[in-house]
Swiss-Prot record:
It is found in: Cytoplasm, Cytoskeleton; Cytoplasm, Cytoskeleton, Microtubule organizing center, Centrosome; Cytoplasm, Cytoskeleton, Spindle. GO terms for molecular function: microtubule binding. Phosphorylated in mitosis. The gene is ndel1-a. Residues 334-345 have a biased composition (Pro residues). Residues 19-190 form a coiled coil. Its main location: cytoplasm. It comes from Xenopus laevis (African clawed frog). Keywords: Coiled coil, Cytoplasm, Cytoskeleton, Microtubule, Phosphoprotein, Transport. Pfam families: NUDE_C. This is Nuclear distribution protein nudE-like 1-A.
Length: 345
């Protein structure tokens, strides 16, 4: 409106009308502006009150939020401390578990190594066990052979003792038969003196008996033993009342000759065994002795070998007449001289 140009008036009335209308327009605009101002003031007051209430609420909310923030900060600090403490504990626990894991792995490696060593030792022990079993079987076999040999030697020793007994008995019987022969010869000499016509017949009979005895084969040793045990019943001792028949006398002479030959063979056999035992004893006496314990053990072993058959010493006491002392049973069997009968016969 300020920029509006004032028109030119033709008359004062037109000017007055113009200014009146202008004033009316300005007054109306003023009224409108005033109303708007009043309305704006009222609206601004309401808005201010509302903003104040909102500000109060915002301040209250801000205070609440600040308190909540402070509380949350405290909680965060506490949680952070707890987290740090928990992290430290977990780190310590993890480090401890790692150490334990390292120790467990080292122990596991050691155990694996120990298991391998045990397996190797077990294999060695199994091989040693198999070798021991084989050696034990070999030892048992040798022990059984030694036991069998010992039993065989004991049986030979028993047979030898029985042979010594039978030889002594046969010696007694031979002595009795010699005495009986001497008595018979004296009787025959008396009968020859009383009857001079019969000597030729008796000489022929005795010559035929001697030739028959020389022509007969040698009696086996088993039969000799049987005859030696049965002779007291079948052969009279010269003091009985029953006289000997010529056939019985021939058989008795044959048995006596065989027995004398066997006794001589046995005596030579025993002498050879005695010489062999003396040689063995002399060889043992010349062996060097290194330790006292070895000497004592050898003495004990020799004494054990010598007295291992103490139950048979009575028969050897009887056989000691020939000067024979038997060697150890467990020792090696002496070789038989050529042309001699074995002791096991």
């Amino acid at each position: 409106m300020e920029n509006e140009e004032i028109p030119e008036f033709l008359s004062p009335k037109e000017e007055i009308v113009y200014w009146r209308e202008l004033s009316k327009r300005l007054k109306q605009s003023y009224q409108e502006a005033r109303d708007e101002l009043i309305e704006f003031q009222e609206g601004s007051r309401e808005l201010e009150a509302e903003l104040e209430t909102q500000l109060v609420q915002a301040e209250q909310r801000n205070r609440d939020l600040l308190s909540d923030n402070q509380r949350l900060k405290c909680e965060v600090e506490s949680l952070k401390e707890k987290l740090e403490h928990q992290y430290a504990q977990s780190y310590k626990q993890v480090s401890l578990l790692e150490d334990e894991l390292a120790r467990a792995r080292s122990i596991k490696d050691q155990l694996h190594k120990y298991v391998r060593e045990l397996e190797q030792a077990n294999d060695d022990l199994e091989r040693a066990k198999r070798a021991t079993i084989v050696s034990l079987e070999d030892f048992e076999q040798r022990l059984n052979q030694a036991i069998e040999r010992n039993a065989f030697l004991e049986s030979e020793l028993d047979e030898k003792e029985s042979l010594l007994v039978s030889v002594q008995r046969l010696k007694d019987e031979a002595r009795d038969l010699r005495q009986e022969l001497a008595v018979r010869e004296r009787q025959t000499d008396g009968t020859r003196k009383s009857a001079p016509s019969s000597p030729t017949l008796d000489c022929d009979k005795t010559d035929s008996a001697v030739q028959a005895s020389l022509s007969l084969p040698a009696t086996p040793v088993g039969k000799i033993c049987d005859n030696s045990f049965t002779s007291p019943k079948g052969i009279p001792n010269g003091f009985g009342t029953t006289p000997l028949t010529p056939s019985a006398r021939i058989s008795a002479l044959n048995i006596v000759g065989d027995l004398l030959r066997k006794v001589g063979a046995l005596e030579s056999k025993l002498a050879a065994c005695r010489n062999f035992a003396k040689d063995q004893a002399s060889r043992k006496s010349y062996t060097p002795v290194n330790l006292n314990s070895n000497s004592s053990s050898s003495v004990l072993n020799s004494s054990g070998v010598k007295y291992s058959h103490a139950g048979h010493t009575s028969f050897f006491d009887k056989g000691a007449v020939n000067g024979y002392e038997p060697p150890g049973v467990l020792g090696s069997r002496p070789p038989s001289p050529p042309g001699m009968l074995p002791l096991s016969v």
